[in-house]
Amino acid sequence: MSLAVGSAQAQSVQTNEELVNELLTYGDANDDEIGNFDFLYRNNGKSLEYDELMVENIIDEAISHLGTRYVYGSKGPNSFDCSGFTSYVYKHQNNVYIGASSREQYAINQPIKRSEMQAGDLVFFTSPRSGRNVGHVGIVLDFDPITDTFTFIHASTKQGVKISKSTESYYQKRYVGVRRVK
């Protein structure tokens, strides 16, 4: 394992204390860098900054496809159906398989409470064809816990890839749940 902060580099670090000592030895590390390394060490190298960057990349990738036409069964990048769009974005940005269909994506990803929703999560709805079952999926762009509303990006059958709001009556009555990609 090789971690770098500034010009300090630690290789095969066994303990947090050794890591901090190595940073101090180089003389380049400030308190913020040491604190960040401490956080990285305790969280197996996964930092909040990395998660935010990952979500930002997913959102940027999704938005770059605004206006792309809808074609049932299409997996992109020139056209998408709803699950083809979400799976393409996650596979293209993070090389993560999230499932092929909206039902599979709903089944295999981590259930979370609506109140815990955040950007990058998958949001699910019924569709006219699916009855009470999951039939549509999008990617959450933002969530307002005060109003319990969110915006999301998805491949719409009539308008292609677009941004919608949970306050639209069509989606209000069809909301099923939210999942976090594992």
Range-by-range predicted roles:
Residues 3-18, 22-32, 134-182:
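Aromatic- and glycine-rich peptidoglycan recognition patches
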Residues 41-62, 68-71, 79-82:
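Mature, secreted membrane-active peptide modules
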Residues 64, 68-119:
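Catalytic cysteine-centered active-site loop
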Residues 66, 90-93, 124, 142, ...:
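Generic helix-packing signal
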Residues 72-73, 125, 165:
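Thr-Gly-centered strand-to-loop micro-motif
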